[in-house]
């Protein structure tokens, strides 16, 4: 299995940080992607880090990179996971945000199966009520139209 990991926004993306600037999405998600890549490789998956650069890369460039990998490795063998941080409030003060979410393409797709696995794993590995938030077995999978989802050929 080829897994493309997209690490969200870049260092130069306005607003993608905590109110006091101590938590910067680009730094945090890039570390998450590196850690996840190591774990996936331990399980014999081939990992492609979509954006190794520190700066933000436009969506159309990301889509071209995604499609190149999908064409080379096979659409049926490739999964895209884009990691972002969610926020609460208007960015001017710290809030007490918790939890996480999973977004998939509109309609019933193979990405829904992965989302279901993520929710089940969260329930198994994270006790209800800890700082990461509360997850339940009927947690919603958010379906959206994102440029990278619409124009990418991978699943």
Q: Whereabouts are the PLM-identified features?
A:
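Boundary/activation segment at the start of structured domains
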Residues: 1-9, 21
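Active-site-proximal helix/loop segments of hydrolytic enzymes
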Residues: 2, 27-155
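Acidic side chains
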Residues: 6, 13-15, 112
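A short small-residue
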Residues: 11-18, 99-101
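Glycine- and acidic-residue-enriched helix-capping/strand-helix junction motifs
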Residues: 15-31
């Amino acid at each position: 299995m080829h897994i493309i990991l997209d690490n969200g926004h870049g260092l130069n993306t306005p607003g993608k940080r905590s109110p006091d600037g101590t938590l910067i999405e680009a730094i945090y998600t890039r570390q998450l992607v590196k850690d996840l890549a190591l774990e996936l490789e331990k399980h014999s998956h081939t990992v492609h880090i979509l954006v190794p650069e520190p700066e933000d890369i436009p969506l159309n460039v990301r889509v071209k990179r995604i499609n190149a990998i999908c064409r080379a490795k096979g659409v049926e063998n490739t999964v895209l996971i884009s990691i972002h941080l969610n926020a609460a409030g208007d960015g001017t003060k710290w809030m007490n945000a918790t939890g996480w979410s999973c977004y998939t393409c509109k309609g019933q797709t193979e990405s829904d199966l992965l989302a279901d696995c993520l929710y089940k794993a969260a329930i198994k590995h994270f006790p209800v009520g800890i700082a990461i938030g509360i997850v339940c077995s009927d947690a919603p999978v958010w379906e959206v139209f994102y440029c990278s989802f619409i124009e990418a050929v991978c699943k």
